[in-house]
């Protein structure tokens, strides 16, 4: 089973992934972008270099293609539980150039079985971002991140509608413990 956690920066994905590592010790934990050695290099270029948005989108698509080929496919073949911090959903939400068609090509149509969507309101996002150093995307501001969050939700539900992916939508302002319990139960529930 392939499970992804999605949400804007500051929604608590990394915290939840950390807790899930203790709960699902035999799972394969990965991330996008940067889930492979090549992916780390592509991610660094995409986030830190002054390049066009189109070039950035293709770097992330390249990372996604390599990630699926070298990490996701082998783990699925071994019937492992895969838990990923981000996926193609982020790729589509963060870039105007990253379409579903391009992402299906990059992922060889391998899609998450389950999507955990952590959503946060404007005040919660402001508070959390004030506590960390910001990257190029986060520096675009709260309104930009809220637009990205709406896109994440739209794309997650589009995958549910078109491909049957299961979606668990959570309020990221709930307690870390409550969120963890709900996410763990969602992962354990085999439909």
Swiss-Prot record:
Keyword field contains Transferase: yes
Which InterPro entries would you find in this protein's record?
P-loop_NTPase, Thymidylate_kin-like_dom, Thymidylate_kin_CS, Thymidylate_kinase
Sorted alphabetically, which CDD domains does this protein's record hold?
TMPK
The terms under GO molecular function for this entry are: ATP binding; dTMP kinase activity
Its biological purpose: Phosphorylation of dTMP to form dTDP in both de novo and salvage pathways of dTTP synthesis.
Family as reported in the entry's similarity comment: Belongs to the thymidylate kinase family.
Q: What is this protein called?
A: Thymidylate kinase
